[in-house]
């Protein structure tokens, strides 16, 4: 069931800067969504428009089928957890979580059990009387979430809310947030510039750049089938090479022809080829589909990151559990399914239509 729809949302500021360009988004109830993109891509502006803190220049916002474009933020069934958590330092944990309920003039006999349940949900039982200054960053994060969910919103918005935490705590909170969302069964919309956060937590991701949605879909679909160069480079590490489509299932790059899993592209059309570094296997040069020379190598704990160059001066990034010697000639082996072919300047709409048509033609055969 759809809970939020943005239709043709544009945001233009007085200085002429266009933050959002014809944004169309559908959010289903009970799922975890991420708005992912670099700084200035428009992701936080979308969040603020959904929350009611910012008005769009044009377009409509729908909530449960009703137009709420002009509805005051306080009247929306939506709560927000901000990047700095916005906790009140002069109030203890209980008072922070209870704040919204007190504003609504709820009686104390309703507030106490509601706050207790919210703190239990975020695993902060026994912390009600703690001062905010006594809490770690992760605990403050959970208090902010408890304060938001105690109001029983239908949608929870989180604006870069893990960015202030250290790497280990950020990883722990990814599991925590996903678990909380599953328990509550409400819609989470999470804004981040961190691809790992988006990939690990989301049911669906919207990738933004320059005020436009570049691609939307499941984490697996976006990682395995980026629609353009920006998405391929922004989501994970990639080897991206210029190529030419020979025919269905055959593509040429690095002066060789290779079997691939892509079709529906014109013969001789210029394309870009994406191969993820973890899909490259290091083999003996005579067994490799491509031969490269190792240039640099970093040990990253669970794998080596190797940069190499082929005879055509193409650079290759390889992730391997085995290291190599610098200057060593090595073979790279990959399967047809490891090759992803991208058309130049193809939109997601055109990409989806091509795949649907091509797969439909295959089924008829």
UniProtKB/Swiss-Prot annotation:
Residues 4-235 form the ABC transporter domain. Pfam families: ABC_tran, TOBE_2. It comes from the Bacteria. PROSITE patterns: ABC_TRANSPORTER_1 (PS00211), ABC_TRANSPORTER_2 (PS50893), POTA (PS51305). GO terms for molecular function: ABC-type putrescine transporter activity; ATP binding; ATP hydrolysis activity. InterPro entries: AAA+_ATPase, ABC_SmlMolc_Importer, ABC_transporter-like_ATP-bd, ABC_transporter-like_CS, Mo/tungstate-bd_C_term_dom, P-loop_NTPase, PotA-like, PotA_ATP-bd. Its EC number is 7.6.2.11. One of its GO terms (cellular component) is ATP-binding cassette (ABC) transporter complex. It is found in: Cell membrane. Keywords: ATP-binding, Cell membrane, Membrane, Nucleotide-binding, Translocase, Transport. It is a peripheral membrane protein. The keyword Transport applies. It catalyses: ATP + H2O + polyamine-[polyamine-binding protein]Side 1 = ADP + phosphate + polyamineSide 2 + [polyamine-binding protein]Side 1. Its main location: membrane. Belongs to the ABC transporter superfamily. Spermidine/putrescine importer (TC 3.A.1.11.1) family. The complex is composed of two ATP-binding proteins (PotA), two transmembrane proteins (PotB and PotC) and a solute-binding protein (PotD). Part of the ABC transporter complex PotABCD involved in spermidine/putrescine import. Responsible for energy coupling to the transport system. This is Spermidine/putrescine import ATP-binding protein PotA. The gene is potA.
């Amino acid at each position: 069931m759809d809970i939020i729809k943005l239709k043709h949302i544009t945001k233009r500021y007085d200085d002429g800067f266009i933050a959002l360009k014809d944004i169309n988004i559908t959010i289903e109830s009970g799922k975890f969504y991420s708005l992912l993109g670099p700084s200035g891509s428009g992701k936080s502006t979308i969040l603020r428009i959904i929350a009611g803190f910012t008005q769009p220049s044009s377009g409509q916002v729908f909530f449960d089928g009703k137009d709420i474009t002009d509805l005051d933020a306080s009247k929306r069934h939506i709560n927000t957890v901000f990047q700095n958590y916005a906790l009140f330092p002069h109030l203890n944990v209980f008072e922070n979580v209870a704040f919204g309920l007190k504003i609504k003039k709820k009686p104390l006999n309703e507030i106490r059990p509601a706050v207790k349940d919210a703190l239990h949900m975020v695993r902060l039982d026994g912390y009600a009387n703690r001062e905010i200054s006594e809490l770690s960053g992760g605990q403050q994060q959970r208090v902010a979430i408890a304060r938001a969910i105690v109001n029983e919103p239908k949608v929870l918005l989180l604006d870069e809310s893990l960015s202030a935490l250290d790497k280990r705590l950020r990883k722990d909170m990814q599991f925590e947030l996903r678990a909380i969302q599953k328990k509550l069964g409400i819609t989470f919309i999470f804004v981040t510039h961190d691809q790992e956060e988006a990939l690990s937590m989301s049911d669906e991701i919207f990738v933004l750049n320059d005020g436009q949605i570049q691609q939307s879909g499941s984490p697996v679909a976006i990682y395995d089938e980026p629609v353009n160069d920006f998405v391929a480079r922004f989501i994970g590490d990639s080897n991206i090479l210029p190529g030419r489509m020979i025919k269905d299932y055959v593509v040429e790059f690095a002066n060789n022809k290779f079997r691939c899993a892509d079709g529906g592209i014109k013969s001789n059309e210029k394309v870009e080829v994406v191969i993820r570094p973890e899909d490259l296997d290091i083999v003996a040069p005579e067994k490799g589909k491509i031969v490269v020379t190792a240039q640099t190598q970093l040990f990253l704990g669970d794998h080596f990151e190797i940069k190499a160059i082929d005879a055509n001066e193409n650079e290759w990034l390889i992730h391997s559990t085995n290291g190599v010697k610098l200057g060593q000639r090595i073979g790279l082996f990959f399967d047809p399914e490891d090759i992803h072919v991208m058309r130049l300047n193809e939109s997601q709409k055109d990409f989806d239509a091509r795949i649907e048509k091509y797969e439909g033609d295959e089924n008829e055969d």
